């Protein structure tokens, strides 16, 4: 078997969407599993919408996810360049080859004339499939002269054979496109830029791509691409069209379902390992049904056979759970480094590590850290009502806490025990009211952890504030 070569070919017209990230991930996993090559190609032929800033963001997001590529626009490779805007000469060269072989032809129709033809076919109840007979009448000597005078170039159309095309898709199975289901289609636009289907085939063919794994919204394009492979006499890659990602309500995933870009999840404090784990299970399943997986485990267990046909549901709650699991898998040194930017406070690592240890099991998104940890940096804004029982209880506790020389959990527990012997507040009431006195909140980390982290002076000060209010 020849070396597996797969690619991810995004358009730099926006931020990397989770659907695109999943496509990149499946290609990456297959390349790493087979010892093949993962190629990054930038499809920037949409001159109006493509922006350099989005290309930079795509590259940044893929690097953050840990999906490193073997060839690409930033590192080069044997089959570059890896930006379509730098390959336009190739598209013209191969279009000319097809014209010379009678497999493609020039069309001197203006875009609005093509649109009128489309509307006419639809009004007649016909599919808007163009043929050479429909398009070549525009190629009059007068029109050619007009184009020349205006400095315009003709579009180039591919002459589609009227035959059935059969695709053996590794996810969908056998897919048949009946003869006449697709008409002739443009290869080069009148502005000289290639269409998606054409550029895609030229690039995949010249870059020796062996497998094309992508979303099933591209399935309808495949017949045009296969026809072009046959026209050039190139081997057709193996196609695999993975299921669409749906929102929790069963409709196509969109911004109304919440965050959909990798950048948004990153800014909310999702770990790349968690997002990769989650995306891998949208359209693929582990042979043993495991759900928490490292990238290495994903590589080792990945196979095309386990890609599923059914649409995948994007469940934000499951992603939160996975993120919390991956957070707990991190060493404290790693977590301090990753989490510190989300804290928005200048704090030394040792103190922050103690706080993280106390709140780690409560973190779903690292962006929650300011809210989860504010009790360690701010005195409570609201204090519980002062009652005679509480005053007596916490005056006694304060006295016991002041006696402690070595501030640790054992000493604090001992102080609790002594204070409660004569306390008017017992058990649950003792601890719940003390939590409110120290934090102003009814829930949070273990109470003993709060006292230990705050330290003797701060605890004494907070209890004194309550008693003296």
Curated annotation (Swiss-Prot):
Highest taxon in the source lineage: Bacteria
Pfam families: Anticodon_2 (PF19269), tRNA-synt_1c (PF00749)
Motif annotated as 'HIGH' region, chain positions: 10-20
Gene3D superfamilies noted in UniProt: 1.10.10.350, Glutamate-tRNA synthetase, class I, anticodon-binding domain 1, HUPs
Keywords: Aminoacyl-tRNA synthetase, ATP-binding, Cytoplasm, Ligase, Nucleotide-binding, Protein biosynthesis
GO process annotations (BP): glutamyl-tRNA aminoacylation
EC annotation from Swiss-Prot or TrEMBL: 6.1.1.17
GO CC terms: cytosol
Catalytic activity: tRNA(Glu) + L-glutamate + ATP = L-glutamyl-tRNA(Glu) + AMP + diphosphate
Matching PROSITE patterns: AA_TRNA_LIGASE_I (PS00178)
InterPro entries: aa-tRNA-synth_I_cd-bd, aa-tRNA-synth_I_codon-bd_sub2, aa-tRNA-synth_I_CS, aa_tRNA-synth_I_cd-bd_sf, Glu-tRNA-ligase_bac/mito, Glu-tRNA-synth_I_codon-bd_sub1, Glu/Gln-tRNA-synth, Glu/Gln-tRNA-synth_Ib_cat-dom
Motif extent ('KMSKS' region): 252-256
Cell compartment(s), UniProt: Cytoplasm
Molecular-function annotations in GO: ATP binding; glutamate-tRNA ligase activity; tRNA binding; zinc ion binding
Enzymatic class: ligase
PANTHER family linked: GLUTAMATE--TRNA LIGASE, GLUTAMATE--TRNA LIGASE, MITOCHONDRIAL-RELATED
Subunit structure of this chain's protein: Monomer.
Function, as annotated: Catalyzes the attachment of glutamate to tRNA(Glu) in a two-step reaction: glutamate is first activated by ATP to form Glu-AMP and then transferred to the acceptor end of tRNA(Glu).
Family statement drawn from the similarity comment of this UniProt entry: Belongs to the class-I aminoacyl-tRNA synthetase family. Glutamate--tRNA ligase type 1 subfamily.
Record-given protein name: Glutamate--tRNA ligase 1
Lineage: Bacteria, Thermotogati, Thermotogota, Thermotogae, Thermotogales
Gene: gltX1
């Amino acid at each position: 078997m020849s070396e597996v070569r797969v690619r991810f070919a995004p358009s730099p017209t926006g931020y990397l969407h989770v659907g695109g990230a999943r496509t990149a991930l499946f290609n990456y996993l297959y390349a790493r599993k087979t010892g093949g090559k993962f190629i990054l190609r930038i499809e920037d032929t949409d001159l109006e919408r493509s922006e350099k800033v989005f290309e930079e963001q795509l590259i940044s997001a893929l690097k953050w996810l840990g999906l490193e590529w073997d060839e690409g626009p930033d590192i080069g490779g044997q089959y570059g360049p890896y930006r379509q805007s730098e390959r336009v000469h190739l598209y013209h060269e191969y279009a000319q080859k097809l014209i010379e072989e009678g497999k493609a032809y020039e069309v001197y129709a203006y875009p609005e004339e093509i649109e009128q033809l489309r509307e006419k076919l639809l009004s007649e109840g016909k599919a808007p499939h163009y043929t050479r007979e429909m398009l070549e009448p525009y190629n009059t000597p007068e029109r050619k002269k007009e184009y020349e005078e205006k400095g315009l170039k003709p579009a180039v159309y591919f002459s589609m054979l009227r035959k059935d095309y059969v695709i053996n898709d590794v996810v969908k199975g056998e897919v048949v496109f009946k003869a006449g289901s697709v008409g002739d289609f443009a290869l080069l636009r009148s502005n000289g830029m290639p269409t998606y289907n054409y550029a895609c085939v030229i690039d995949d063919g010249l870059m020796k791509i062996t497998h094309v794994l992508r979303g099933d919204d591209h399935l309808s394009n495949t017949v045009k691409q296969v026809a072009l492979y046959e026209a050039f006499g190139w081997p057709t890659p193996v196609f695999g069209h993975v299921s669409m990602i749906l929102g929790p309500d069963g409709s196509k995933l969109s911004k109304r379902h919440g965050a959909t870009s990798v950048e948004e999840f990153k800014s909310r404090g999702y770990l790349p390992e968690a997002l990769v784990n989650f995306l891998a299970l949208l359209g693929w399943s582990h042979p043993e049904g495991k759900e928490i997986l490292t990238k290495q485990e994903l590589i080792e267990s990945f196979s095309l056979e386990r890609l599923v046909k059914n649409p995948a549901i994007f469940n934000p709650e499951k992603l939160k759970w996975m993120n919390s699991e991956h957070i707990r898998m991190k060493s404290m040194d790693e977590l301090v480094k990753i989490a510190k930017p989300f804290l928005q406070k200048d704090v030394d690592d040792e103190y922050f590590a103690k706080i993280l240890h106390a709140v780690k099991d409560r973190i779903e998104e690292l962006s929650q850290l300011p809210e989860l940890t504010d009790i360690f940096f701010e005195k409570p804004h609201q204090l519980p009502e002062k009652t005679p029982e509480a005053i007596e209880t916490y005056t006694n506790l304060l006295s016991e806490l002041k006696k402690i020389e070595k501030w640790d959990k054992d000493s604090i527990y001992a102080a609790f025990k002594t204070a409660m012997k004569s306390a008017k507040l017992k058990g649950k009431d003792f601890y719940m009211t003390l939590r409110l006195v120290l934090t102003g909140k009814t829930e949070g980390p273990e109470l003993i952890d709060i006292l230990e982290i705050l330290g003797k002076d701060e605890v004494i000060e907070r209890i004194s504030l309550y008693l003296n209010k």
